[in-house]
């Protein structure tokens, strides 16, 4: 997925999260001709999702207008996370759109938000925290119920289909 210069600079400044104890998953989706992979940890409180990547291996013809429509539809569909999603960045030539929580979660020490990056053949879902004191951005787990996880996987699959 080709990122805009702004998004690339931003992504380069996000530190990887500490996801020890998370299980890696990898599924082949024959119908979609793609793969679903990521890492998560299940507990009594639900699921902590480190990251999920859905990639379609058979390229699909897609205009930027259609990609934007899919991103807008996804932002409306994914209404079960703690914050609503809005388009914050896009790149017409690179066929890339970034959704983010607006407004994000804030407290005295940090700001956290969900981020979904949508490309022509790839979708990445993750949660990022900005720690004010250290001025550091780091990937953190996204807390979901099992039902929310299944719905999220269904919704991103529909967006890339």
Model feature map: region roles:
Residues 35-40, 111-125, 152-153:
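Short, structured motif recognition centered on aromatic/hydrophobic residues
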Residues 30, 101-106, 127-132:
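Short acidic, glycine-rich loop/turn motifs
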Residues 108, 117, 140-144:
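Short, well-structured alpha-helical patches and their helix-loop capping segments
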Residues 10, 17, 71, 103-106, ...:
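Residue-level detector of solvent-exposed, low-hydrophobicity positions
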Residues 1-78:
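Charge-rich, low-complexity N-terminal segments
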Residues 48-115:
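The feature represents the first ordered module of a protein
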Residues 11-12, 29, 45, 89-91, ...:
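Acidic-enriched, low-complexity/disordered segments with a strong bias for Aspartate over Glutamate
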Residues 122-161:
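Mixed-charge, glycine-accented linear interaction segment located at domain edges/termini
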């Amino acid at each position: 997925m080709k990122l805009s210069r702004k998004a690339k600079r931003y992504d380069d400044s996000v530190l990887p999260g500490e996801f020890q104890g998370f299980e890696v998953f990898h599924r082949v989706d024959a119908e979609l001709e793609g793969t679903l992979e990521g890492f998560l940890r299940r507990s009594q409180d639900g699921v902590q999702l480190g990251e999920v990547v859905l990639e379609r291996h058979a390229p699909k013809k897609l205009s930027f207008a259609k990609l934007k429509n899919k991103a807008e539809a996804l932002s409306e569909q994914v209404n079960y996370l703690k914050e609503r999603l809005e388009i914050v960045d896009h790149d017409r030539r690179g066929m890339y759109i970034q959704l983010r929580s607006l407004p994000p979660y804030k407290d005295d020490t940090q700001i956290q938000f969900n981020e979904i990056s949508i490309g022509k053949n790839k979708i990445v879902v993750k949660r990022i925290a900005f720690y004010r004191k250290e001025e550091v951005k780091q990937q953190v787990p996204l807390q979901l119920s099992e039902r929310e996880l299944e719905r999220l996987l269904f919704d991103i699959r529909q967006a890339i289909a």
